[in-house]
Regions:
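Acidic, surface-exposed loops and disordered segments
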Residues: 1-223
Length: 223
């Protein structure tokens, strides 16, 4: 793949909260997971497992579990109409494949474990975009209030980590243009000075602007 093609795919990947009711083929789900399993992982331990949920009753129960933690401001559980949920799990037993000193120290090996899962999750979203599908992160599934109940619901082994969930389907709307920081403001070569980075005021200004953009996007997705 050429760089320009990769960049176009990355730009195409956007979080969408409104989906068409049309089901997506099992083949598309398998293609998403096939891409994800090629993601990099620490010493190739491949800690991931994937739970695919299509059953309406199960999806409704996942939504109810999500709501138990309280709705986010202006962001109700609007992922509920997606035809497929894909939950990414991490199997901590795979840490045994790391070097012994690293495998024995959870404080040191957990970042490797999390980074491996993060890579697979990003690959899932890029694969969905390449297939013309819309996707949305639902990280709430990994929070302490939800993990135990979700594991019970789906028969997930107790020791596993619920990393994240992607909801996926055909987009019902077109994504808005994304608000991005200027590239030249975020690249630093070699040792940098404090003045090379944004001031507190600049960070706050962008945070306010991107929050406004995000809330407008969420509101549009729900209309």
């Amino acid at each position: 793949m050429e760089y320009d093609s990769l960049l176009e795919l990355v730009k195409k990947r956007r979080s969408i909260r409104r989906f068409k009711p049309d089901p997506i083929p099992d083949e598309s789900v398998e293609k998403i997971i096939d891409v994800a399993r090629w993601a990099p992982s620490g010493l190739n331990i491949q800690p991931w497992e994937f739970v695919v949920v299509k059953d309406r009753e199960l999806k409704d129960r996942i939504v109810k579990l999500s709501e138990a933690g309280g709705p986010l401001p202006r962001d109700p559980m609007d992922f509920s109409n997606a035809p497929v949920y894909i939950i990414l799990l991490g199997d901590p037993r795979t840490k045994a494949g790391l070097p012994p000193r690293l495998a024995a120290n959870n404080e040191m090996n957990q970042p490797v474990f999390n980074s491996s899962l993060a890579s697979a999750f990003l690959y899932m979203h890029l694969a969905a975009a390449a297939l013309g599908l819309a996707s949305q992160w639902m990280s709430r599934v990994g929070l302490p209030f939800m993990q135990p109940e979700l594991k019970k619901l789906l028969g997930i082994p107790e020791g596993f980590q619920v990393y994240d969930m992607m909801v996926v389907g055909y987009p019902a709307i077109k994504a808005r243009e994304k608000l991005l920081r200027p590239k030249d403001k975020m690249i630093h070569y070699g040792a940098a000075e404090k003045d090379d980075f944004r001031t507190d005021e600049e960070v706050e200004d962008f945070a306010n602007r991107t929050r406004t953009w995000a809330m407008a996007t969420i509101g549009r997705d729900k209309d």
